[in-house]
Amino acid sequence: MEEYQQAISDSDSLKQDVAKLFYKYDLLICPTVPGPAHLHNSNTLEIDGQKVPARNALRATVPFDITGSPSVSVPFGMSSNGLPIGVQIIGRHLDEETVLRAAAKLEASNQGGYHVPPGF
């Protein structure tokens, strides 16, 4: 029970910290994953030259999942290997409209810079 209570407390602290960011910024834009997409049939990916479990790619989205912040991932080009790269746009609590508007603008400005690679 103690661990659960600590997790709730940590979650509340994270929510407060993220909310403070939006005193200054309307949106946050950051990588969706720490590198290009990995192949769907692969259980590992390479980060900084090291093979790691593919599930580690989710670590950039977890804080915003915990805080309940509205977010969306948008294609943002291709790697030198032809794999898609994405960014996530995160907004204020309950401000999905701003997040989706920004995502639509970013996607529209990236015409021709993204295509679904074979096998995806």
Enumerate the predicted regions with their spans.
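Serine-dependent amide/ester hydrolase catalytic core
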Residues: M1-I66, V116-G119
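Structural helix-boundary/capping segments
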Residues: Q5-Q6, Q16, D65-F120
